[in-house]
């Protein structure tokens, strides 16, 4: 059975990696599908994100990494996937994901959505939070794979890390 795990992964976090690793135990193949979202300005290019994911999933024999644009369900159909794999951090994630699952099912009746709840230690984690912490010089080593922490450090090396008040006239 093929599962597609879609996302922007900008950057991939340990929460994402946890879902990938657990998905690999459940499915014959897990396709990590990096989306090219025209509504978001990414920190890393699609190629960089693919390389980051490839590096931190080398230990998983049944992972494929790919990129796509357009509807996730259309991509899943093209890949002949039976499952969309989604991670849930909180009830608020479930409300959104449930709506998406119903919409995807209406577009492609053969697709099922499987939700994996994140491990407790990652229930608060998001790529946006990781970027914010890294941007201001905080350590993200406990939030992302080691290769991604290095990439983030390089990316924000020129950003001032001290919080300072903004002078008002």
Swiss-Prot record:
<feature type="binding site">
    <location>
        <begin position="8"/>
        <end position="9"/>
    </location>
    <ligand>
        <name>ATP</name>
    </ligand>
</feature>
<feature type="binding site">
    <location>
        <begin position="87"/>
        <end position="89"/>
    </location>
    <ligand>
        <name>ATP</name>
    </ligand>
</feature>
<keyword id="KW-0548">Nucleotidyltransferase</keyword>
<feature type="binding site">
    <location>
        <begin position="122"/>
        <end position="128"/>
    </location>
    <ligand>
        <name>ATP</name>
    </ligand>
</feature>
<comment type="subunit">
    <text>Homohexamer.</text>
</comment>
<dbReference type="GO" id="GO:0015937">
    <property type="term" value="P:coenzyme A biosynthetic process"/>
</dbReference>
<dbReference type="InterPro" id="IPR001980">
    <property type="entry name" value="PPAT"/>
</dbReference>
<keyword id="KW-0173">Coenzyme A biosynthesis</keyword>
<feature type="binding site">
    <location>
        <position position="8"/>
    </location>
    <ligand>
        <name>substrate</name>
    </ligand>
</feature>
<comment type="pathway">
    <text>Cofactor biosynthesis; coenzyme A biosynthesis; CoA from (R)-pantothenate: step 4/5.</text>
</comment>
<keyword id="KW-0067">ATP-binding</keyword>
<feature type="binding site">
    <location>
        <position position="86"/>
    </location>
    <ligand>
        <name>substrate</name>
    </ligand>
</feature>
<comment type="function">
    <text>Reversibly transfers an adenylyl group from ATP to 4'-phosphopantetheine, yielding dephospho-CoA (dPCoA) and pyrophosphate.</text>
</comment>
<feature type="binding site">
    <location>
        <position position="72"/>
    </location>
    <ligand>
        <name>substrate</name>
    </ligand>
</feature>
<feature type="binding site">
    <location>
        <position position="97"/>
    </location>
    <ligand>
        <name>ATP</name>
    </ligand>
</feature>
<keyword id="KW-0963">Cytoplasm</keyword>
<dbReference type="GO" id="GO:0005737">
    <property type="term" value="C:cytoplasm"/>
</dbReference>
<feature type="binding site">
    <location>
        <position position="16"/>
    </location>
    <ligand>
        <name>ATP</name>
    </ligand>
</feature>
<keyword id="KW-0547">Nucleotide-binding</keyword>
<keyword id="KW-0460">Magnesium</keyword>
<dbReference type="GO" id="GO:0004595">
    <property type="term" value="F:pantetheine-phosphate adenylyltransferase activity"/>
</dbReference>
<dbReference type="GO" id="GO:0005524">
    <property type="term" value="F:ATP binding"/>
</dbReference>
<protein>
    <recommendedName>
        <fullName>Phosphopantetheine adenylyltransferase</fullName>
        <ecNumber>2.7.7.3</ecNumber>
    </recommendedName>
</protein>
<dbReference type="InterPro" id="IPR004821">
    <property type="entry name" value="Cyt_trans-like"/>
</dbReference>
<comment type="similarity">
    <text>Belongs to the bacterial CoaD family.</text>
</comment>
<keyword id="KW-0808">Transferase</keyword>
<dbReference type="InterPro" id="IPR014729">
    <property type="entry name" value="Rossmann-like_a/b/a_fold"/>
</dbReference>
<dbReference type="Pfam" id="PF01467">
    <property type="entry name" value="CTP_transf_like"/>
</dbReference>
<feature type="binding site">
    <location>
        <position position="40"/>
    </location>
    <ligand>
        <name>substrate</name>
    </ligand>
</feature>
<feature type="site" description="Transition state stabilizer">
    <location>
        <position position="16"/>
    </location>
</feature>
